[in-house]
Structure formats: structure tokens, C-alpha cells
Design a protein with these regions (language model features):
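Glycine-rich phosphate/diphosphate-binding loop of Rossmann-like nucleotide-binding domains
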Residues: 1-41, 292-294
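Short alpha-helical segments enriched in small residues
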Residues: 231-398
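Conserved hydrophobic helix-helix packing surfaces used for dimerization/oligomerization
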Residues: 4-6, 147, 270
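Proline/glycine-rich low-complexity loops and linkers
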Residues: 42, 48-55, 59, 76-172, ...
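Accessory alpha-helical/coil subdomains and C-terminal extensions
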Residues: 141-143, 149-216, 223-226, 230-232
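Short beta-strand elements
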Residues: 138-140, 211-213, 335-343
Length: 398
């Protein structure tokens, strides 16, 4: 198996001033290509430290993806570190300098003299095109390791990995078939409870069951080599059975996207009224392309369950919408969720059984609960369901 590693650079990454989303993306992308990362390192803007780790990893890794440090400023040191590690100088590539000049001219801006630095790469390096930015990438061979140097801007990094680096790896190495990863997401069950019920399952050789908890959901992943695909598919119904009523979607589509697709397929429009969730439902559904006719965020106010139901029903009629979803304000750890449909209006009154979580987490949970209520109606399931540490204390149909 190839030993594939990543090196993230920059003081802001090392000190936690920005989240290293590039590392997470690359790990997931390469895993799905059959190239799981074996190590990740982070080094700040220190030339000696960069040179040292490049030389160290060149004796251990087959492939190293270096990210960041290709900008025009004095703390962008990756090209110099690569040249120093190789014992050679930097050379200016006139074709990339011309490309940068054209890049700025097309945007009506002069190119700063400092940008010339981005056209300088180690003398023996292969230049790698960056079709969406000014920092060219490059590749070098250092000892046993093929190293790729990439810009830190996520949009540039992803394009370079997908369009330039992965094809080179496929040409250079015989890559394994990507692993099989079956996923489902649950809402309202604890990780320990799910694990207790899944542990008795006999997994095929080389197959592992994984859990990813991200409040308010838990993702279950069955991952294994491609040759175990049939055995994994045969086992998957048992995993679904354990998830049971808490299963909200399979794959990676996400609940808002699933709901948006269902609404579009059934030609149903939706209107929203939010108090406690503060527009979170509107944000999630609009990003997913749901057919929203109207959405509002109103100040929290005391209301009974019947009032919440009537409000949702009135919103649906007044906006000529197929559906209306309303979330009330929170009062003494209680709140109401109401869904008005062509078949009638259904409302739940719920109570938080755990209050230690932050406001943001509770808003996320309530938004998910409201989306799940909508999902269950769209799928023809009973609307009332428990939600872990949110207890249903009353319900109403009208």
C-alpha cells in the first residue's frame, strides 16, 4: 500500500487561528479514491522546520501533499524550503509569470512586484498548473518521496488535487480499487445505544463499523475493501434495522437536500415561521434549493400548542403554500413545532430533558427535529417520534 501523507503549513493553521478544512477534505477525497492518508503533519512558517520535515518525510512517505506557503508574502516559504531540502536554487518560470500578468490584467489590476515570487519554483521541479489562481503548484522527487506543493486557498487546492495531482498519481502508481463505504444518519439515538445493538453483528473480514457523532446526528459507516461489497450489502439491512425509526437518510445527501428534492418531485411549496430557530430552517432549506414561498423570523412569544397549530394553518392558507412549518419560542424549556399540510395540521409540544448544551446546539437540534417532522410526513410515516434528550409532552391534530 502506498504511504501517502499530508503536510499543512502556516502559523495560522498551527496555532488554530483557522480550521484546516483542506486536510479534512483531502483525507476524505483520497480515502474515496483508495488512497487513505497514513499521516498528517502541521508546521508553522519556519524555514528550518519546513526543510527538516521535508527531509524527514522524504525517507518515509511515498507521496507527500504539501499545502500552503505559495503566496507572494515573506512568510510564504514552501518553494524555498523545497529548494533548500533538495540542495538547489529557485528559478523563475516566464510562462507562469506571463500567466499571472494576464490574470491581473483581465481583472483590471496591475500585478504587484511581490507576485513574481509565485513564479519561482525549485530548479528540478515540474510546474503544476493552477487554473483558478496565481500560485502555481509544483512537484519534486526527494529521496523516495514524490512531493506535490499546493496553494492554501481551498478552491485552488481542490481543483489542483482533482485535475492535476490525482491523474499524475494514477499514471505513476497502480492504485487500489476504492473502498466501499455505506452510510446512514440517525437522529434521536445515543452513540452508545447504537453501538450496543450493533456490536453483536458479525462483520466480514476487513470491514469495520464506524460512528461519527455531530450533534444532533450520528452517522453510521460500514467501510471495507471492494472485494467485500456483496457481503457488506447483505449485512446492511441489519444495520438499517438497528437504526430503526431514528434513520433519517442514507448516503451523504443530507436531510435538507432530501426534503428539497421530495418537495420538488411532489410539486409542493413551503412557507416557514421561526422563533427559537432564528432562521436556521430557512438557511438550510434555501441552500438546498427547496421551493420556499416565504419565511419569517418573529420575536419569541408565549403561545399554546393550539395557537401554534392555528398559526401554521393560517400561514399555509395566506401564502397559498402546499405546506407550512412553524417553530415557536422557548418557554421554560418547552417549545412547539407545527406542520400544516393539505391533510390537516399536526403540532408537537416538546421539552428539553438536558439543558447543558449551548443555545446554538439547541437551535440545531430543534431545526433538525422540525425537518424530521416534515420528512416523516413526506414519507407517510407517523409524525410523533422521540428525539433523545427532547421529550414529546403533548401533540395535537386538527
Amino acid at each position: 500500500m502506498l504511504n501517502v501523507e499530508m503536510l499543512s503549513t502556516g502559523d495560522e493553521v498551527l496555532h488554530g487561528q483557522i480550521v484546516d478544512t483542506n486536510a479534512a477534505w483531502l483525507a476524505d477525497f483520497f480515502f474515496n479514491q483508495g488512497l487513505p492518508l497514513t499521516r498528517r503533519n502541521t508546521v508553522g512558517d519556519d524555514l528550518d522546520a519546513l526543510v527538516a520535515i521535508l527531509r524527514e518525510r522524504s525517507e518515509q512517505a511515498d507521496v507527500l501533499i504539501v499545502n500552503g506557503g505559495l503566496g507572494p508574502t515573506s512568510d510564504d516559504l514552501s518553494a524555498l524550503a523545497a529548494a533548500t531540502a533538495k540542495g538547489e536554487g529557485l528559478i523563475l518560470h516566464p510562462e507562469w509569470l506571463e500567466n499571472m500578468t494576464r490574470f491581473f490584467a483581465e481583472r483590471g489590476r496591475p500585478m504587484a512586484e511581490s507576485n513574481r515570487k509565485q513564479a519561482e519554483i525549485p530548479a528540478s521541479a515540474e510546474m503544476i498548473n493552477n487554473p483558478v489562481g496565481t500560485a502555481c503548484g509544483f512537484a519534486i522527487q526527494l529521496n523516495r518521496c514524490l512531493m506535490f506543493f499546493t496553494p492554501g486557498v481551498p478552491s485552488e487546492f481542490k481543483v489542483m488535487v482533482e485535475q492535476e495531482i490525482l491523474p499524475r498519481l494514477r499514471q505513476r502508481f497502480t492504485l487500489p480499487e476504492p473502498p466501499v463505504c455505506l452510510r446512514l444518519t440517525t437522529f434521536g439515538r445515543s452513540e452508545s445505544e447504537l453501538a450496543q445493538n450493533l456490536n453483536p453483528l458479525t462483520l466480514p473480514p476487513g470491514v469495520v463499523m464506524g460512528y461519527r457523532s455531530s450533534m444532533p446526528i450520528i452517522e453510521l459507516k460500514l467501510t471495507g475493501p471492494a472485494e467485500q461489497r456483496d457481503a457488506m450489502l447483505a449485512l446492511w439491512p441489519e444495520v438499517r434495522k438497528v437504526a430503526g425509526d431514528s434513520l433519517i437518510f442514507e448516503g451523504t445527501e443530507g436531510l435538507p437536500a432530501q426534503i428539497a428534492r421530495c418537495l420538488q418531485e411532489r410539486q409542493l411549496s413551503l412557507t416557514l415561521s421561526e422563533q427559537f430557530t432564528g432562521g436556521l430552517l430557512a438557511l438550510q432549506l434555501s441552500r438546498a434549493g427547496a421551493p420556499l414561498l416565504a419565511s419569517e423570523v418573529v420575536p419569541a412569544q408565549e403561545e399554546t400548542l393550539a395557537q401554534a397549530a392555528r398559526w401554521a394553518a393560517e400561514r399555509r392558507i395566506n401564502h397559498f403554500a402546499g405546506l407550512a412549518l412553524a417553530v415557536s419560542g422557548q418557554e421554560n424549556d418547552h417549545l412547539n413545532v407545527a406542520l400544516a399540510t393539505p391533510d390537516g395540521t399536526f403540532a408537537l409540544r416538546v421539552k428539553f430533558s438536558v439543558t447543558r448544551h449551548s443555545l446554538a446546539v439547541r437551535q440545531e437540534v430543534c431545526a433538525m427535529m422540525a425537518l424530521n417532522l416534515l420528512r416523516r410526513w413526506l414519507n407517510g410515516q407517523p409524525l410523533a417520534s422521540e428525539h433523545g434528550w427532547i421529550n414529546v409532552v403533548d401533540s395535537l391534530s386538527m
